[in-house]
């Protein structure tokens, strides 16, 4: 074990002795809440042979808050592989794979880009609404290095138009309107640092997303639903004292106030059905701008976000699956982003991305452009599911916009499983309707109730009695109408034919009434049958007056009804009223 450690240590020493930093030019952009560092290294191979790896050093403070790091050959496309190594003398060490070995005596120029978060300290920590925000940046005038540096320079960019209160002097150095320049310094030994502090005005809103929960639901029926829950907090200088809406509106600084007033979220160009809401409901102070390659959602919260204030909201949209879901046979690949561009220079403390896949997927694999934590998979049951859908859970902390990159989820899914839910729904509704039909057509009672059955039959008989009464009433009305026509035509044959038709219809309905009254007597007793018999009695009184009525019609010389005719019409009307009363009393 000791031998292996000694060999590793010896290899590290040889690697450090193999390079010399001929020139280092570092630029620190501290104009926002994210400190963006771009360092151009010119290395010379002073070793005994070709070298394919070089070591980069950061201070432990930078490494502790490092969010993103990338490396590349200056002037060339593509990224170099970079990996973290054990620390040396209070410096964090990263190894860069150059891909192509560098010959002895040759030089290589590489550029290292860093994104460092939450290192700018507000000073003072509390300010009034009308005050500007000042912050302090702690760094080193010398670029941390494991190699001797021949020449180096550091440029710190501060906010445009902002005040520079102070900056540590390390000769040679100079302060300008919007930047501080340290160097050039020559022949700086390895591991040498020189702490400096820059105190300057920075009114960028230091708004942090403490949590971003992104939910991606994949459907093979043509849609991918995306929803994000975001919690924001302003971690800049806290607002000291009350907030005045009037002073806020009249502030001439406008967007240079240290508060988040509005921001633009960039969504994919195919995004549709966009919604944006908070705990209260939909927020109308937002607008959607369609661009050539994106959809911009301009969001204005219900209130500006000052230091110490927080808010949360939900934003969601739909995407066409043909743009992001690829297939070959039963193999599928989902390619989308781990998170969207929330707004410029956003810092996300914790990102949790969940991918809801269709039920019964198999052989799921995830490929990400950078390391993420893959949490245990979950199951989420939805409509018509039997076992629940698989949910992938990916997490990462300390996120910046540079992390908004595509990742890929591959899986297997059979076509028959896609048809299972529609067929299941069809079978369910078919079964439901079949049960309803069977239930409505059959009597499932164990034993019948004689009294209830008799009552039901009685109700049917009463209905038939009412129909017979209506039919006889219609026969009387037809006879009366024929009599009125006779007054105009004096056609005796038509009148006699109408009388015969009336008598036949009356006799048929009376026969029906007699049969129904007999049945009613059996089911409901003699009392009900006796009442029903009155229907025949009232009818007989009217029928006995038919001949006298017709004779009066034949003798009449006017179209108006005479005395005998009117008496007959009154008898018909009275008989119908009595019949209705009898039916109601049974």
UniProtKB/Swiss-Prot annotation:
Residues 1-15 form the signal peptide. Residues 16-421 are lumenal. It is found in: Endoplasmic reticulum membrane; Cytoplasmic granule. Pathway: Protein modification; protein glycosylation. It is a single-pass type I membrane protein. Pfam families: Ribophorin_I. One of its GO terms (biological process) is protein N-linked glycosylation. Disruption phenotype: RNAi-mediated knock-down is mostly embryonic lethal. Embryos exhibit cytokinesis defects which lead to arrest during development. Embryogenesis proceeds more slowly and embryos are osmo-sensitive. Defective localization of the yolk receptor rme-2 and impaired yolk secretion. May result in chromosome segregation defects. Its main location: endoplasmic reticulum. This is Dolichyl-diphosphooligosaccharide--protein glycosyltransferase subunit 1. The lineage of its organism: Eukaryota, Metazoa, Ecdysozoa, Nematoda, Chromadorea. The gene is ribo-1.
């Amino acid at each position: 074990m000791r031998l292996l450690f000694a060999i590793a240590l010896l290899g590290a020493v040889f690697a450090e002795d193999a390079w010399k930093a001929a020139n280092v030019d570092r630029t620190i952009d501290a104009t926002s809440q994210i400190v963006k560092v771009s360092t151009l290294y010119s290395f010379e191979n002073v070793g005994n042979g070709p070298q394919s790896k070089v070591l980069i050093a950061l201070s432990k403070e930078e490494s502790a808050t490092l969010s993103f790091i990338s490396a590349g050959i200056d002037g060339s496309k593509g990224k170099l592989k970079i990996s973290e190594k054990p620390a040396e003398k209070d410096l964090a060490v990263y190894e860069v794979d150059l891909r192509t070995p560098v010959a002895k005596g040759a030089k290589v120029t590489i550029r290292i880009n860093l994104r460092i978060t939450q290192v700018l300290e507000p000073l003072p920590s509390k300010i009034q609404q009308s005050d500007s925000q000042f912050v302090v940046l702690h760094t080193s005038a010398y670029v941390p290095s494991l190699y001797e540096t021949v020449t180096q320079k550091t440029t710190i960019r501060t906010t445009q138009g902002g005040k520079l209160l102070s900056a540590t002097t390390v000769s040679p150095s100079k302060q300008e309107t919007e930047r501080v320049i340290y160097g050039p310094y020559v022949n700086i030994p390895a591991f040498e640092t020189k702490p400096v502090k820059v105190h300057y005005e920075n009114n960028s809103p230091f708004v942090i997303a403490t949590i971003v929960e992104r939910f991606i639901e994949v459907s093979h029926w043509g849609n991918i639903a995306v929803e994000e829950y975001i919690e924001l907090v302003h971690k800049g200088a806290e607002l000291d004292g009350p907030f005045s809406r009037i002073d806020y509106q009249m502030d001439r600084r406008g967007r240079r106030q240290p508060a988040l007033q509005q921001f633009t979220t960039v969504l994919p160009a195919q995004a549709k059905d966009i919604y944006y809401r908070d705990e209260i409901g939909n927020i109308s102070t937002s607008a959607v701008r369609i661009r050539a390659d994106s959809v911009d959602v301009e969001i204005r919260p219900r209130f500006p976000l000052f230091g110490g204030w927080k808010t949360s909201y939900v934003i969601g949209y739909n995407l066409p699956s043909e743009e992001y879901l690829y297939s070959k046979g039963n193999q599928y690949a989902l390619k989308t982003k781990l998170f969207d561009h929330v707004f410029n220079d956003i810092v996300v403390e914790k990102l949790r991305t969940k991918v809801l896949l269709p039920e019964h997927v198999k052989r799921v694999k995830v490929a990400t452009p950078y390391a993420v934590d893959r949490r245990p998979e979950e199951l989420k049951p939805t409509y018509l599911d039997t076992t629940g859908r698989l949910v992938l859970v990916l997490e990462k902390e300390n996120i910046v916009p540079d992390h908004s990159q595509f990742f890929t989820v591959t899986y297997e899914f059979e076509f028959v499983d896609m048809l299972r839910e529609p067929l299941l729904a069809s079978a369910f509704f078919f079964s439901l309707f079949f049960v309803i039909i069977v239930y409505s057509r059959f009597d499932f009672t164990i034993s019948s109730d004689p009294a209830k059955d008799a009552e039901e039959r009685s109700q049917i008989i009463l209905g038939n009695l009412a129909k017979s009464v209506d039919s006889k009433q219609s026969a009387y009305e037809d006879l009366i109408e024929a009599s009125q026509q006779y007054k105009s035509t004096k056609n005796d044959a038509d009148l006699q034919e109408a009388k015969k038709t009336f008598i036949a219809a009356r006799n048929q309905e009376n026969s029906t009434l007699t049969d129904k009254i007999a049945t009613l007597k059996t089911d409901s007793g003699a009392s009900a049958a006796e009442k029903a018999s009155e229907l025949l009695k009232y009818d007989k009184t009217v029928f006995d007056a038919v001949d006298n009525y017709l004779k009066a019609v034949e003798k009449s010389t006017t179209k108006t009804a005479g005395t005998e005719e009117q008496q007959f019409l009154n008898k018909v009307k009275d008989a119908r009223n009595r019949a209705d009363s009898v039916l109601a009393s049974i």
